[in-house]
Amino acid sequence: MNREIYDFVAIGIGPFNLSLASLSAPLRGVRTLFLDKKSGFDWHPGMLIETSTLQNPFLADLVSLADPRSEYSYLNYCKLTNRIYSYYMRENHYLSRAEYTRYCQWVAARLPNLRFGCDVQGVLHDPESHSYLVTGQHTMSGQRFMFRCRKLVLGLGSQPYLPACCDRRAAPFIHSADYLRHKYELQGRASITIVGSGQSAAEVFHDLLRESGRHDYSLAWITRSPRFFQMENTKLTLELISPDYTEYFHDLPEARRQEILTQQNSLYKGINASLINQIYDLLDEKVHDGDNRYTLLTNSELRACRYDPLQERFQLDFQHLDCDRPFSHATDGLVLATGYSHEIPACINPIHDRIAWNADGSYRIGRNYAIDHEGSEIFVQNTGLLSHGVTNPDLGFCCYRNSQILRELTGTEHYRIETRTALQEFSPPADGVLKHRPARRAERRPTVAARPLMDIHRATL
């Protein structure tokens, strides 16, 4: 047993906990440990499609919105890997998924507080020492381990969600999370169907559409959504993923929060507008060239999925929601781009009674992201959609959340936590009267002689 007592141990190393590790590593006197059963950092490897990009700009890296001077920033990664000038010349603020993964792997290799290949199998509470024991097994050697800590952070991520009618044991369908691993096998089928409407579904459809000229498959994209809608990214709308809105959202009654989330799908479930346009343009070219192998259909809910192993075909039953009419669909290959869901990890079963639970069995998450009854010992990442809203899965918000979590874990605000970030109001005035803001008194400004305009961005000295 390791006799060192850590200030906190974090379980799971995805982007959110990797951000927390990056922000906590420089803090003197703060002893931390991050554990993951994988052999190294690997973020959605099945969706590292060549043309796929993040929907956040590069500033939403692991650290910059909390500490722009951090050695773990994306720009420092570019500088130290001799890529900063090529990135500057590209003038593209959106990273590919593959580039973001390379950046995260670069950071992970430099952090001293990460331990991969550690399968956490149990978490116990020791009331005498007021500490937690994190136990498990090294995946390579099989050797047992035990670490003691005062606090915990759970960042185990989400699991592929499957519709209730789809039984993985009975049918060899593919979830989009595993798409690349099965792509070439899939392209050997006579027909392929994608079910789902979000970014992942669009990326898979676009990838198969681009390469369909080299193959003979027919391609269908079917979704329950009423349309193939784009993700909203206008500036005032984006303030709904600001710290100010998160505070406002958390204070609303739970029933109202549930209603609001159903209205905000386009904030976090939509498709990048440029990708929608690329799909349309490519479809238009193919149709005008006489290639009509493609079907897109909305308002269609999957009700049943059967697989015939002799014919190696899927038989799908749908219900068209607008017309209230059923229809069937046969296909040789099936990709379910049906999103992800959170599962309670079995390793925390021994401390179940120390955690606050909602009636539906989910965590009751406090404003500070704590889930224990005291609100000060056990914290979670990326499981608070109902409690904190659409900022929960957003990469750009992780620095703000981690700055808050670090303050709760250590008792010190190591990184400034902004309290006023939005240009708009979300709550009505407390006194019931909305007043105009006072006009700013005009200041006399010095007169400067006019100078010729020039493009200083491209100026050469």
From Swiss-Prot:
PANTHER family: L-ORNITHINE N(5)-MONOOXYGENASE, MONOOXYGENASE. FAD binds at residues 9-15. Keywords: FAD, Flavoprotein, NADP, Oxidoreductase. Its cofactor is FAD. GO terms for molecular function: oxidoreductase activity. Belongs to the lysine N(6)-hydroxylase/L-ornithine N(5)-oxygenase family. The keyword Aminoacyl-tRNA synthetase does not apply. This is Alcaligin biosynthesis enzyme. Pathway: Siderophore biosynthesis; alcaligin biosynthesis.
